[in-house]
């Protein structure tokens, strides 16, 4: 165990933390394991050992991110660059915070951390040394230190010796803000960022993902301004060095489809694309575990072992896990270091330029085809739309689809206007000669979800080039190019109209969905570039 390793209380005092007695610096996994299972711990600090060897923790009432409690200091650094919640047509979570309120929140967190035994983890965000962030995480909770050790890139001893942080994350999960009403904030909880001080503050929420996605939001600010694409996607590479990226919102299949025994994983959630190629921001994976089974997702199941950290799962008395129990939350998760997956890119999670760009959508309306090949304008249109839909059950068992449009398949994490991400992505794609595809992993007219077997065969056809050589026909209204046949895929499902009792049924649902697309895209028409893309979308 390295305690301090040259990190002094004085360095923490520079951030406003005083009276530091004990710094546990970059703790080993073995030490974290002992700390988390310390029988004297109470409440959400306490970990429970499971039969798989991984420790499980509870994150309290926050079992997901708290977007309504996210704030960014509006000052000279950010005023003219950030995509603000109170400007323009697009709705987002980037609520402005005054420098005065920031100082108040910072005082709350530093007082919470002062006089405590602190865990400090220094790690990298970004696998490219030229553009990575050196991040210092400070917390009083052992498992939160474990979470960031899993999720970020672990520096070597040599890198730690010369580590100079670019960004500080102070996690004061145990403190809240009693003055939130007078300050015009959403609640007593807060996740706040200051780009001038290069710091994130967390108060009131124990959810580990706030640290992960907080740094993603920062990369989403810094990289596109340098012409580097910053993407909410998974990525993998084939035997010939061919790289594919998979964009998609939560639950559309990013982690599942990119974890492919035939290809090496670059990463499952956050990537950049620069002059050298595609690189992971992270050093770990954060997989959903609801209804996880060894049969359906063996790689993820086998990654849950010692050093993995489970969140909000139900652990039985005997230490076994009920993965089917979503009573705490449907968003049960596990974080693990990326090397828990066997088939990964080593030693650094990066590869060459992507030639296949896949947009995953789970269309609960049953309108979109399982796969279509996009033109350059359609690529931008569907990237900015970021569509998926969930099935929400109602009391009588009728299931109505709920549409979600999330710009760039990750609106919650965007720091700049969505068109800036689209422009950078398109430039990178054009330079690499990349082709985009829209893949529907959702439902069709039968009311059943498209099988994972068919979806995997579709992904194979995209990656091995057979889809590009297939004959296509055009789906009306959406003007999408669909292959007439693909190896290993039931031909009947390729045209979504065939899965309905009559084409009129599809037509009716298609009109509903097309209108939703058109209404959503209106917010991008306030720029000439956005207005020009309307023609690439559906037409009624």
Swiss-Prot record:
Q: What is the effect of changing residue 268 to N?
A: In PCK51; altered-activity mutant that catalyzes the conversion from oxaloacetate to pyruvate (OAA decarboxylase activity)
What's a single GO BP term from this record?
A: gluconeogenesis
How is the protein's activity regulated, according to its record?
Allosterically activated by calcium. It may represent the only case of a monomeric, allosteric enzyme.
Q: Which UniProt keywords apply?
A: Acetylation, Allosteric enzyme, ATP-binding, Calcium, Cytoplasm, Decarboxylase, Gluconeogenesis, Lyase, Magnesium, Manganese, Metal-binding, Nucleotide-binding
Instruction: Note the effect listed for residue 65 to Q.
Output: Slightly lower catalytic efficiency compared to wild-type and the affinity binding for OAA is 330-fold higher than for wild-type
Binding residues for Ca(2+): 149-150, 152, 283
InterPro entries cross-referenced by the UniProt entry: PEP_carboxykinase_ATP, PEP_carboxykinase_C, PEP_carboxykinase_N, PEPCK_ATP_CS
What cofactor does its activity depend on?
Mn(2+)
Catalytic activity reads: oxaloacetate + ATP = phosphoenolpyruvate + ADP + CO2
Pfam families membership: PEPCK_ATP
Q: What is its EC number?
A: 4.1.1.49
Name of this protein: Phosphoenolpyruvate carboxykinase (ATP)
Q: Can you name the source organism?
A: Escherichia coli (strain K12)
Q: What is the lineage of its organism?
A: Bacteria, Pseudomonadati, Pseudomonadota, Gammaproteobacteria, Enterobacterales
